[in-house]
Amino acid sequence: MPFRTEHVGSLLRPAALREARRDFAAGAIDAETLRAAEDDAVLAALRAQDAIGIDVVTDGEFRRADFRAGLAAAVTGLREEVFDSAWRSGDSEVTVKSRVWRVEGPVTQTAPIAADEAAFLASNASVPFKVTLPSPGYVAERFFDPGTYAPYASVAELAETFVRILGDEIAALVELGVPYVQLDNPGYATFLDGRARTRLSAKGRDPDRAFREMLAADRALLESVPREHGTTYALHVCRGNNASSWQHEGDYDPVAEELFGSLPVDRLLLEYDDERSGGFECLRFVPAGTVAVLGLISTKVATVESPTALLRRLGQASAYIDADRLALSPQCGFATHADGANAVATDAQYAKLAVAVETAHRFFDGR
């Protein structure tokens, strides 16, 4: 039976962990002390998720600054940039501190990306757990800096390097016994959003070509990963998530048939927490054998969703895809960026996960 409930990956960092990380940055504690604080926080998060009964747990991404940081720390050839960028919150545009890495030299892996996280989970999780990684198509598009390093003459050439690095990492994770690997790609939402496509064109990048190059990189990775151990593979199509703000809007329909049909994944995690995500009609393109995990629960607002409303939306979705191929989750992480946590209290975070479990029992039990 497929997993009926999960969350995207990140959880709100507890105060003690945030303090330990500040102390480490200031030189007041050593790496071993920080690691102990991380371990304690992860164990507490596992206990909380177990108590709720969610089908798949994570370590909350507590050891990361954001969803890309593990990769960036594990390779050479990148420089970090911090800048102000325009995000959206409600009907307003807001300025959010963002960061990105740019390629400035040969990208080679020098350390594990997530294997240390996975080993701790393998020793301490009592139910299936997942490990999240940024997708190669996304990081190649975002990290490419034209003209800074000649051997990477194009995004596609850089993507080949990240496909190889992430493929090696996933093989190591599978050997460690990781049951579920999720790729995160906020880049696909660019191609749903007219304004984002216009900005991409203004930079001299053809949006349709960029989409197909991104898709080709992610497909190349997913076609190379080990399948013999029954590992679950998923893609999360993110619309941006930082301090309760977001970046992209639009229906999935313009890319759904090609996107959903091209990637050999077991699960597609799709954001559906408000009207900017469009309707469920695109679910007709989800291939047989793939589960659509509907992100109906918002990590951006404190209000805990009503099971009745969630049941209604699951019913609406089942008009386009068999109900047995649905699952339920929040739309994105609760703290994709450790310093840009969403405006949700920890109690509300876990209440939202509990509502997901309750709703799933009511919708799926007996089917």
PLM regions and their residue ranges:
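Domain-level signal for soluble alpha/beta catalytic cores
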Residues: M1-R367
